[in-house]
């Protein structure tokens, strides 16, 4: 067996743009023959996938699965809405979901490693970058989920609630985007940051500091209610808060997870002229 040196791996990386482990694997399989390694990587789609890896994957799907007292939520990204609806992409996302659920895997790096070969093959076939972005789970007495299309997904753990109520509250979370379960759950860091913002606004209006501070105290109570699930008006019955509805049913929400496709990812928007210019440079 040929000695696979660091210099050989480096050369293959420079010529293909593929990752170090992919290059090393290809060289081992080709017994150190770099030309054969490149040919094999082209056939497997590894080079094409490496070229697509720099493309921003900000579209995709959210998947959820619940059995008994265990639930899991997953986001898999692609680049366009068109590919997000592709049967092959959907099947890949479902397979990742099932594997994560069966193994109770919540470390996304473990999932990425497990499905890297399939991901690379799918990238080569579809022509877009694909990324297993994040995964999370909840356990609880009563679990519920809600999917708004395939772009927003919610997982909820509750106590004392029936399935219908949990589903309604999951729908509320999808629509209203609470950040915390209860007002008292709002972190001190978030409270302090908002307090300073509101105090600056009040002071800029010319109010004395003592009056400004009292004004801000009232605003902060409103703020913690607005960003917490139980403090928000219930979307199905806006005259009541979610907390009041839960109390009427002797129920409680323990935790929730809300995923929205692409949130926090900067999606690059190119105009037509820029796309033509980019294509001309590649040709």
UniProtKB/Swiss-Prot annotation:
Q: What is its main location?
A: cytoplasm
Ordered alphabetically, the record's keywords are:
Cytoplasm, Elongation factor, Protein biosynthesis
A GO CC term assigned to this protein in UniProt = cytoplasm
Q: Where is this region: Involved in Mg(2+) ion dislocation from EF-Tu?
A: 80-83
Q: Which PROSITE patterns match?
A: EF_TS_1 (PS01126), EF_TS_2 (PS01127)
Q: Keyword Cytoplasm: yes or no?
A: yes
Name the family: Belongs to the EF-Ts family.
Tell me which HAMAP family the record gives: EF_Ts
Q: What does this protein do?
A: Associates with the EF-Tu.GDP complex and induces the exchange of GDP to GTP. It remains bound to the aminoacyl-tRNA.EF-Tu.GTP complex up to the GTP hydrolysis stage on the ribosome.
The protein in question is named Elongation factor Ts
Q: Which organism is it from?
A: Serratia proteamaculans (strain 568)
The primary gene name is tsf
